[in-house]
A protein has these predicted regions:
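Catalytic core of nucleotide-activated saccharide and alditol-phosphate transferases
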Residues: 1-81
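Catalytic donor nucleotide-activated moiety binding site of glycosyltransferases and closely related
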Residues: 71, 75-112, 154
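Catalytic binding pocket for nucleotide-activated donors in carbohydrate/polymer assembly enzymes
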Residues: 100-104, 111-209
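Non-catalytic N-terminal targeting/anchoring module and adjacent flexible stem/linker
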Residues: 211-229
Length: 229
């Protein structure tokens, strides 16, 4: 099993360079899935504990690697401050050895601390990297914890977890509307919608598909299909 977690253009080894050894290749990106003939999975979120703060100390947070988008993210932060909002953006280098190459780079932060700050924010920023069209882990974190999402990824509207009260597309809406958006209550997702984005659901579907293959070999009825993934 091989899973591309980022856009394929960021990987040295492309799908057509992988030996035909019976591996299944998966991606979170629908465009990459179609382009390279890979299996598409909507999400593999691992459910964890935690609860968002009732008294957040910042409006929008972002903790992530540069990936060629740092200048745009920091510029967005300045625009938010000009609107009277309180963003907290920390950019890390793509590799640790690059830490001192740019003055705004911050040391790597443990994921536990990132999640803690995300839960103490009114919203989290998800900024597209080059070649990305699928949703990211940040999107799924927000949906799981009920933290609002600010993003420039228009593809989010194609997903059934999208709700305009939960997701602010800042390239489609004026930034001046962000403050009022943050005041609107988060709309909780239906459990049957959310579960499709969890790793437990994906594993269950793989097992079901394997059982169906065994049944076909035995000449038994196929049962339900897992093609909806």
């Amino acid at each position: 099993m091989l899973i591309y977690e980022d856009p394929i253009l960021r990987y040295v080894i492309k799908p057509d360079q992988i030996p035909a050894c019976g591996y299944e290749a998966w991606t979170f990106d629908p465009v990459d899935a179609k382009k390279f003939g890979l299996n598409f999975v909507k999400g593999l979120y691992i459910t964890e504990g935690g609860q968002k703060s009732e008294t957040p100390d910042c409006d929008v947070c972002f903790f992530g690697k540069d990936k060629g988008r740092a200048e745009e993210i920091l510029s967005l932060g300045e625009r938010l401050r000009a609107l009277g909002l309180n963003p907290l953006f920390q950019i890390m280098p793509d590799t640790k050895v690059q830490l001192h190459q740019k003055p705004y780079y911050q040391p790597y932060i443990p994921f536990s601390r990132i999640r803690e700050q995300m839960l103490n924010s009114r919203a989290q920023l998800d900024y597209l990297q080059q070649g990305q069209s699928g949703i990211s882990l940040r999107t799924l974190e927000c949906m799981h914890y009920g933290v609002k999402l600010v993003t420039n990824n228009p593809e989010i509207e194609r997903y059934d977890i999208y709700h305009p009260d939960n997701v602010f597309l800042f390239e489609k809406r004026p930034l001046e509307e962000l403050a009022s958006f943050l005041c609107v209550p988060f709309v909780q997702l239906a459990p049957e919608v959310w579960e499709q984005y969890t790793i437990e659901y994906w594993i269950s579907t793989l097992r079901q598909r394997e059982q169906q293959a065994c049944d076909r070999e035995k000449g038994e009825p196929r049962g339900k299909s897992a093609d909806h993934l």
